[in-house]
Amino acid sequence: LISREDKRYTNQFQVFTDADFDMTLPAMEPQQLNFDQPFFVAEGAELIAKLQVSQVQQTLANQTNGISLHFSSDFGRTVENLANYFYHVEKRVNLAPFEQQIYEIIGDVDLEYALKYMTTFLLKFVKKEVVKQKRPDIFVKTLEAHGYIVKHDEESYRFNLRFDDREFETLVFDDAHDFIAAQIRQCEAVSSCVKLGV
């Protein structure tokens, strides 16, 4: 990010401004955009607001049963969903108050392990509207806390998501400009859903 020459340090990164992008382009179909490098935007740029309101499509998949959970979030990942929780725990980001409550339930449990039990429970709703669970474990409690399932009575739950087979194209970027140009056109918040394995 910086270089040293003749005892002086120089920035080796670009600071993006509004002039670098066409912000009048229409929204695109929801896609999963992947870019894992830092980038810099000029203070006060309209681009910052554009990024903040843009949407990130998130999928949590597991190896056990092929079921995946899909969520949408704002670019800053402030939405209270499972994908953001696991992301914040992995990256050691300060947890929001709600996420701290979730942490008290499941802690820093392995994502694959958690998904195995969560999706196995959710799979029961394919055939039943109401699923009995006399003694909810930490994974069922986490699903309930997020509102993905709701109490039907003291010993059973109802499904509060939807099953959907919608596919989202995944694009991987190695250039910050191209990523930002695509990200600011991601405007659709897709309702949280469960996708069944093939």
Named regions from a protein language model:
Residues 2-198:
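Non-catalytic recognition/regulatory regions in large multidomain proteins
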